[in-house]
Amino acid sequence: MSISADKIKELRSRTQAGFMDCKKALEESDNDIEKAIAWLREKGISKAAKKASAIAAEGQTTVVEKGDNCVVLEVNSQTDFVSKNADFVKFVKDVAEVILKNKSADNVDSLVLPNKKTVADTAIDLTATIGEKISVRRAQLLTKKKGQSFGVYQHFNGRISAAVLIDGEVSSEVGKDVAMQVASMNPKFVNSSQVDKKWKDEEEKLLIQKTIEEGKPKEFAEKIVAGRMVKMLAEVCLEEQPFIKDNGITIIKYLKQNKANKVLEMVRFEVGEGIEKQEANFADEVKAQMKK
């Protein structure tokens, strides 16, 4: 059967599938575009299913604010190269927008995108088209009230995105400065009053042990550690950290200077954070490909 270049072009335009896949689909579907689309989708779901167990630790984060809501989102791919793919970038943008539209970051996979498909189904289609596992990893929505402000910052082409909810009305520049602090310094807590007790107890125990190993008398170890904990808390608590643009003041002082009271919430997503990446052996990969 002769397959015209125009039909292949039309099918590629509608599905984003590769040239040979489109040609094969038309051959298997008697040159019928609609049947070919269905064939590609069926084969695509099969391909996507095979990718389901793959580790996707690359991708992109984004932070978007609209009105009284702000979303921080991470979408993963298997390689950094794919994270720059136009269809992938559009998917990230569309997911962020639909979260803001629905004012909810719960059950993101079930939200319906402008293409009339759910986020989950669109991710499957992308996985089949691009050839890598695509998945929405996490999303968090912040909502502000009267007298509150957002601060947003995206670093290194979406490698890190951060947002803060500030108690007080500040300029977008001040808000961005605080979000930038979160992105660059990666604080664990907003302030010392929010420090997790279990984390603090474990850190104190480790410091006491280290202090004793350094040869300090056991009876003085706790006093020494108390001073070290004060220093550590200043490092891990956002409001107590020295401002990266002016080490002479802390973040809380910077906020006070700008008529704000405190930081209420902070969110920081870094691509692949906490995901154990598979270290592929090149020779093994070649052998695996040869067996296919």
From Swiss-Prot:
The UniProt record lists the keyword Disulfide bond: no
Molecular function, one GO term: translation elongation factor activity
InterPro entries: EF-Ts_dimer_sf, Transl_elong_EFTs/EF1B, Transl_elong_EFTs/EF1B_dimer, Transl_elong_Ts_CS, UBA-like_sf
GO cellular component labels: cytoplasm
HAMAP family documented for this protein: EF_Ts (MF_00050)
Primary role: Associates with the EF-Tu.GDP complex and induces the exchange of GDP to GTP. It remains bound to the aminoacyl-tRNA.EF-Tu.GTP complex up to the GTP hydrolysis stage on the ribosome.
Protein name: Elongation factor Ts
Lineage start: Bacteria, Bacillati, Mycoplasmatota, Mycoplasmoidales, Mycoplasmoidaceae
Gene name as annotated: tsf
